[in-house]
Curated annotation (Swiss-Prot):
A motif (Nuclear localization signal) lies at residues 520-523. The lineage of its organism: Eukaryota, Metazoa, Chordata, Craniata, Vertebrata. GO terms for molecular function: ATP binding; ATP hydrolysis activity; RNA helicase activity; rRNA binding. Residues 159-351 form the Helicase ATP-binding domain. PROSITE patterns: HELICASE_ATP_BIND_1, HELICASE_CTER, Q_MOTIF. A motif (Q motif) lies at residues 126-156. This is Probable ATP-dependent RNA helicase DDX28. The gene is Ddx28. It comes from Mus musculus. GO terms for cellular component: cytosol; mitochondrial nucleoid; mitochondrion; nucleolus; nucleoplasm; ribonucleoprotein granule. GO terms for biological process: mitochondrial large ribosomal subunit assembly. ATP binds at A172, E173, T174, G175, S176, G177, K178, T179.
């Protein structure tokens, strides 16, 4: 029994030796065994990946001519005549920008037309006379703004319904002439109203609400230049004042037909019963997408509650109890509009006017995106500003706007530019009112060619002399990018504009990829489209 185990093992070994060998290749003495340097499984995966990549790539016919997108790597260029299909894969130049090795990469969305979309086909839109404006209003327009000869597309769509007394929402690209589109018809309505001698600063007949004191100064200047020829008085009420100074300012101002105010200053005046809105003929919310932000929403809500807004156009002509016409103007569709309208009027009474290029990238402005390390942004900025200054000495050039995301960055960057002997102005919301007063007007008049600012200068401010916008900090949202880029390429701009954006963080790259994809597909920017519909249910 003890020998049974070893005998079995010996029998098994003999049987294995005597069986024929299978799958064995007899090699000669001169043949060597293959050396496996890459595991077969990994090698098969690489072969499958390469074969799959080759099957997805299709030859693209590159046509001669201008480019829509020009990248550092020529294979990622896209001709202006090429349009990608809806389901066709877009070769993004910014696809790998979240990796740190992508630094120093760049691409540009090129200028594909020379004029602003609002100025195209002006001859086919008729004249201001055809829109229903009276001769005295046309004469005031000719004297105040002689360079405006024909209406833009936005003005052609906006003026007739305003003259008919309709509540209006106008959403159009920046720099398309929206200010004149509401001032002209509303001034004409004021002239048809009560006697001008009954004006009172404490009870204006028109109100224009804007988000910043700089925009209030600008709108007041444009409105007063028109109103001066019509016998109308326009007064501006800016923020940043204490109650005592606000009262003093109100008492010193002459009687007014139209008040241009910021939400904070008007809220203080209404709370103190220094101003009444019961005699309003119209109320305009300019840059309404900004006014409906959380920082302004409560103030704007209170102001609208104090305003007698009409339910229908018939109430505007009531001689005993006239109501106000509501006008909303902005460069993007505002969020939260349904909730706001449900408190003051029905959304069905609102006529919506939108432009064909709403939420689209401007086709007449070159936009460059540079992937940079955070520490390299200052060096790149100084180099661009010095090149711009050198070019301005040899040929006519415009001014430069440098946008930052915070007031502290504006101050810090200002000190850096001072060290490099680069003259500039600074504008940010934390400045005292006395320091902020007149800074943007000085920049518009050309006292300095460079303005370092926050988004306070990106909403509505007219900047026809600006040639370059530099996003030192990439804007946090696509709405902010639209507003910043809209400081160039405006109606009446004297120089072709360009935008340069520094891209640093991964969340910046995500927005850049959305912008590039929209440009390559020739579509509007995602996430901005909206509409005005039924009001949302109010909370009990």
């Amino acid at each position: 029994m003890a020998l049974a185990g070893p005998s079995r093992l010996l029998a098994l070994a003999v049987r294995l030796l005597l069986e024929p060998r299978r799958n064995l290749v007899v090699r000669g003495s001169d043949q060597s065994l293959p050396v496996v340097r890459v595991p077969r499984a990994l090698q098969r995966r690489q072969e499958q990946r390469q074969s799959g990549r080759g099957s997805l790539q299709r030859p693209v016919l590159v046509r001669p001519g201008p480019l829509l997108v020009s990248a550092r790597r020529p294979e990622l260029n896209q001709p202006a005549r090429l349009t990608l299909g809806r389901w066709e894969r877009a070769p993004l130049a910014s696809r790998g920008w979240k990796h740190r090795r992508s630094r120093q990469d760049h691409f540009s969305i090129e200028r594909v037309q020379q004029e602003a979309p609002a100025l195209r086909n002006l001859s086919s839109r008729g004249s201001f006379v055809d829109l229903g404006l009276e001769p005295r209003v046309l004469l005031a327009l000719q004297e105040a703004v002689p360079e405006v000869v024909q209406p833009t597309s936005v003005q052609s769509k906006t003026i007739p319904p305003l003259l008919r007394g309709r509540h209006l929402l106008c959403a159009a690209e920046t720099g398309s002439g929206k200010t004149l589109s509401y001032l002209l018809p509303l001034f004409q309505r004021l002239l048809r109203g009560s006697d001008l001698d009954s004006r009172s600063f404490t009870a204006p007949r028109g109100l224009v609400l804007v988000p910043s004191r700089e925009l209030a100064e600008q709108v007041q200047a444009v409105a007063q230049s028109l109103g001066g020829y019509l016998g109308l008085q326009v007064i501006e009420l800016g923020g940043g004042l204490g109650m005592s100074r606000l009262k003093l300012q109100l008492y010193r101002r002459p009687a007014a037909d139209v008040l241009v105010a910021t939400p904070g200053a008007l809220w203080k005046a209404l709370k103190s019963q220094l101003i009444s809105l019961q005699h309003l003929n119209f109320i305009v919310l300019d840059e309404v997408d900004t006014l409906l932000d959380e920082s302004f929403l409560e103030l704007v809500d209170y102001i609208l509650e104090k305003s007698p807004i009409a339910e229908s156009p018939a109430e505007l002509e009531d001689p005993f109890n006239p109501k106000a016409q509501l006008v909303l103007v902005g460069a993007t569709f505002p969020e939260g509009l349904n909730q706001l309208l449900s408190k003051v009027t029905s959304p069905d009474s609102l006529t919506t006017i939108t432009s064909s290029k709403l939420h689209c990238l401007m086709p007449h402005v070159r936009q460059t995106f540079m992937r940079l390390k955070g520490a390299d942004k200052v060096t790149e900025l100084v180099q661009i500003l010095k090149q711009q200054d050198k070019a301005s000495k040899t040929e006519p050039s415009g001014t430069v706007l440098v946008f930052c995301n915070s007031a502290s960055t504006v101050n810090w960057l200002g000190y850096i530019l001072d060290d490099h002997k680069i003259q500039h102005l600074r504008l940010q919301g934390q400045m005292p009112a006395s320091m902020r007063a007149g800074i943007f007007q000085s920049f518009q008049k050309g006292s300095q060619n460079i303005l370092v600012c926050t988004d306070i200068a990106s909403r509505g401010l007219d900047s026809v002399h600006v040639e370059v916008v530099i996003n030192y900090d990439f804007p946090p949202t696509l709405q902010d990018y639209i507003h910043r880029a809209g400081r160039v390429g405006r109606v009446g701009s004297e120089v072709p504009g360009s935008v340069i954006s520094f891209v640093t963080h991964p969340w910046d790259v995500s927005l850049v990829q959305k912008i590039e994809l929209a440009a390559r597909r020739r579509r509007s920017l995602p996430g901005l489209a909206s509409s005005v519909g039924d009001p949302l249910p109010q909370k009990a």
